[in-house]
Amino acid sequence: MLTTVVGSYPPLLKNPSSFSDKISNVFGTYDAYKSAIELAVKDQVDAGIDIISDGQVRDGMVEIFANSIYGMTVEDNTPKIVGKIMPSPKSICANDLKFAIKVAEGISIEYGQKPKKTLEGSVKGVKGIVTGPSTLVFSSRIEGYYNKKEDAVIDLAYALHKEAEHLERAGAAVVQIDEPFISTGVVDINVAKKAVGIIADGLAVPVSMHVCGEVADIFDELLKFSVDIADFEFAGIPANINALENVNLHGKKIGFGCVDNKTDRIESKEEVENLIKRGIDLIGAENMIADPDCGMRLRSRESALSKLKVMVNVAKNF
């Protein structure tokens, strides 16, 4: 069974220590986040994860896009929509993705393989991640241009489609769209579906959508979105697994969250194994990709790494 992560990893920044780093720091060119990306990549590869991330160490999932997309800004830690939304003139995340690929490939050449349209067999790579348009809009205060949130969602989808294309060109093995707000009930699911379809349109690599939270009531609708992988949490929200009974997957794989990201407690091998077996009984191992419930940014490094190792040790047996 393939393994992946949802995205974020504990961001451990490093002060400049070498002479060249100190000189760079004097001139304001030292990037403290590169060491955090490197650590996140090394830990994920060390744990045996197949499709890793760059760790999303730079900023919150909303702020990193709100600071870069035309028509959006962040003021006093509040994301805002202040004008007509347009794509960023340059990629927001491609440089970190390319650096992560370089680091991973330096550890194992497998992570440098050419991305494929399907995730079959033995696949290694780095995923590119965008925060979904519905989540960005419903996390922001609208102060200009838009009277309807739905219109902002669609414009953001077109802007994020450009970013997804940047990530694909940068070597992403998967493009993932994070849409946690869909599970809250405040988002128009039909608008969200249209927006995700706009982002995914024309991409030559697999597209994944992550929706955390309880999704049993909307599960069937989420499986109609134009993505190849639908990712949910099953460890922290056991009720979600009931939605897998007699489900029509519409040809999708399920990202099967099987370790809880909300606690530092490290699951036993038996816990993870029993949960994955329940998923296999319902939809089959061939339709599953094992991953944590959600991002691991708030966990300690020791907990995050240990959880990933337990998960991989179980998943590789299926």
Task: Name every feature range the model reports, one short phrase each.
Residues 1-318:
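Domain-level signal for soluble alpha/beta catalytic cores
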